[in-house]
C-alpha cells in the first residue's frame, strides 16, 4: 500500500494552512458543536480532513498532528454552456462533513455529463420518462421497465441496456431517469467514496484518469489515487469535518 507520510515541507505547509483557517494552536479542545456532532455520528471531533485547492493536496489531521497527506485532483474551474445554462466545474471552498461512506460505489451522472457528450458529438439529448416509448429507426423502441431502461424489439422482447453504456441512437443521446440501473456507472470512482453533499465526493480513480492526480482536472470532486483513498477511508468515520480552502 502506498502511504505518503508527510515530509518536513508538507508538515510546515500543513501548519500554515491550519493556522490560516483557524484550527491550529487550539490543542485538542473542541467547540461544543463539534462534540455534539461527534457523539451523534461516532466521529472523532479532533480528526479532520483539510484540502488545499491551490496545493492540490489533502491532509488527515489528529489535533495538531498530521496522520497522512496525499496529492489530489480538484475541480478544473472550467465552465460549460449548454441550452442557455452555464455549469462551472469547481470544488467549493468551505467546511463540510463526511455524510456517508460507501464501498465499490457506482457513479450517478448529473445531467451535465450527458450534455457534455451531446455537445462533443453533436447529439441531441433526450430525457427518457417512465411510461413513454422512444421509437428508433430500426423499428425497435426504448422504454423503462422497473429499474431498467431497455430496448424492445418488434416481437415485444425487452432487453435491458448494459449499465455504464451510453444510449446513443439516430443522432440522439438518451438520458436514463434517476433510479434506473442505466443511470449508474460502475468502476469509475475507485474502491470507495466519501460523500460531502451537493454531489461532491472524495473518491478514487479509473485507469483512464490516474495521471490527473495533482492537477485541477475534475468536475468538482476531490480525486485520490486508489491506494491513498483506501488508507484514508479506513481512518475516517461518517461525520468527520472536511475543511476545503
Sequence positions of predicted segments:
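N-terminal pre-domains immediately preceding structured catalytic cores
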Residues: 1-245
